[in-house]
């Protein structure tokens, strides 16, 4: 029986750090949490397109949607609008919605229980997507996303069914948001974490004292203070302040071509026209551009493949994309990767420390949220001597990030664009690696079922793989 408080130490004061602190202090009984934040470290945050999971994550901390949206400059989002990813379409057909949710989850009938992670067996149980794909293949419907996602029409008209008294969306509908990720972390810090007893230390970590590469004894701060704990969380972003010193191995996604971005925040020139209720993902000669509207401004960025274009040329292209508006662009570089194991011994990595592929498809905050939720399960199941079993945790988080990497990859490799060497090379990779066949495998993988996504296996349920196939013009017969 555990009779002493669990001491949790978090390194990193960004979104991952404060999300972890706020959620764990609410969900873990008898714990003490210390968050160490190095002053002066810039945070990565331009504007974040999120998935519906984040709103429920906030609700589990006792935060009302109205409150956090107001305090983070958030707006509602119905879909992701893709432009220019397919050749040969006229102006009206060149874009399509890509929904992360349906308005009524009871539409889904789950296939039989499968435990060995093989593909679904033949059965008489049909998913809604099975029926709609058959209708699409038979020519009975011609716009899969419009039939499958009724919220498509709200995106198209930039309108929403509001409850006028609260100025909130009608709760009969499911939705997501655009959020200022940096403000969200600060909001959790000020309204949940610190008021609930999280200790905040603003000091630089200079040394990690450890027994072996999985067991940390203490952290030494710049002022020589020693911080001990039972569980250490590395939420230090790309710096990986703890796990890098421990020498943890990482898996590199060699197939991920986009590894750099120019980003900036833009003021609206025409607020009513530019603030739209969908994420804009616009294919460009050497990558893609995002536009994410917030209430007070817009986050933009050009995510590009540095093997095909120089930083300066990419900046020049980016300036043209935003009509040479006055701005202060930042260049961000990363290695698409994840740790081979996100949790070992008494150490766990969360957020960018754990892994990052690229900004596409609103995955960054999802990975943070999913990792924190799964960590709670590990803590609840710990032994009396505070030994943590990360086996299932690592399996789920690893699959989740790998699945995100695959989903993003086929956006490029199954695109019909051929206007630059970048896009032609991507198509060759897709053909060589048989990515069309992979779509069917993903659609039929039990870990991508609706039930499995709620258990932390995948961000992208089976129906999103179906939407991707149809939207990219893949033969689904």
Where on the chain are the PLM-derived regions?
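N-terminal Rossmann-like FAD-binding beta1-loop-alpha1 element of flavoenzymes
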Residues: 6-31
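Dinucleotide-binding Rossmann-like beta1-alpha1 core, especially the glycine-rich loop
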Residues: 46-153
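Conserved mid-domain beta->alpha element of the FAD-binding
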Residues: 337-401
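Glycine-rich FAD pyrophosphate-binding loop
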Residues: 25-46
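Long, low-complexity C-terminal extensions of enzymes
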Residues: 377-477
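Conserved FAD/dinucleotide-binding core of flavoprotein oxidoreductases
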Residues: 283-335, 355-366, 378, 386
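Predominantly flavin-linked oxidoreductase catalytic cores and closely associated redox partners
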Residues: 167-314, 372
């Amino acid at each position: 029986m555990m009779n002493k408080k669990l001491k949790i130490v978090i390194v990193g004061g960004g979104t991952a750090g404060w999300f972890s602190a706020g959620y764990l202090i609410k969900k873990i009984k008898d714990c003490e949490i210390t968050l160490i934040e190095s002053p002066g470290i810039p945070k990565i945050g331009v504007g974040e397109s999120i998935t519906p999971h984040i709103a429920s994550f906030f609700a589990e901390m006792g935060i009302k949607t109205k409150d956090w949206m107001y305090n983070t400059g958030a707006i509602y989002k119905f879909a992701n609008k893709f432009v220019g990813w397919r050749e040969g379409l006229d102006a009206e057909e060149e874009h399509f919605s890509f929904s992360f949710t349906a308005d009524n989850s009871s539409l889904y009938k789950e296939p039989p229980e499968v435990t060995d992670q093989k593909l679904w067996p033949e059965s008489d149980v049909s998913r809604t997507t099975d029926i709609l794909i058959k209708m699409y293949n038979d020519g009975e419907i011609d716009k899969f996303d419009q039939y499958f996602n009724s919220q498509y029409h709200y995106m198209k008209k930039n309108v929403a069914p509001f409850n006028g008294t609260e100025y909130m969306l009608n709760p009969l509908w499911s939705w997501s948001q655009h959020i200022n990720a940096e403000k969200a972390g600060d909001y959790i810090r000020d309204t949940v974490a610190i008021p609930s007893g999280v200790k905040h230390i603003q000091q630089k970590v200079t040394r990690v004292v450890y027994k072996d590469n999985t067991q940390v004894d203490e952290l030494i701060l710049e002022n020589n203070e020693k911080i001990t704990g039972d569980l250490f969380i590395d939420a230090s972003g790309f710096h990986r302040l703890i796990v890098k010193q421990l020498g943890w191995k990482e898996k590199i996604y060699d197939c991920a071509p986009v590894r750099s971005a120019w980003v900036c925040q833009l003021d609206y020139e025409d607020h009513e026209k530019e603030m739209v209720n969908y994420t804009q993902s616009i294919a460009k000669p050497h990558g893609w551009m995002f536009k994410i509207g917030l209430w007070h401004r817009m986050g933009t960025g050009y995510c590009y493949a540095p093997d095909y274009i120089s930083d300066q040329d990419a900046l020049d292209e980016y300036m043209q994309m935003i009509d040479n508006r006055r701005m202060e662009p930042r260049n961000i570089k990363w290695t698409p990767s994840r740790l081979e194991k996100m949790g070992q011994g008494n150490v766990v990595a969360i957020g960018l420390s754990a892994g990052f592929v690229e900004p596409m498809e609103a995955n960054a905050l999802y990975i943070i949220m999913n990792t924190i939720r799964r960590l709670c399960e590990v803590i609840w199941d710990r032994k009396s001597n505070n030994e943590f079993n990360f086996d299932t945790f690592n399996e789920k988080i690893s699959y989740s990030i790998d699945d995100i990497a695959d989903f993003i990859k086929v956006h490029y490799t199954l695109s019909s664009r051929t206007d630059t060497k970048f896009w032609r090379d991507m198509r060759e990779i897709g053909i060589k690696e048989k990515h069309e066949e992979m779509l069917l495998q993903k659609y039929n993988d039990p870990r991508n079922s609706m039930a499995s996504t709620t258990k932390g296996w995948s961000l992208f349920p089976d129906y999103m793989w179906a939407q991707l196939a149809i939207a990219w013009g893949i033969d689904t017969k």
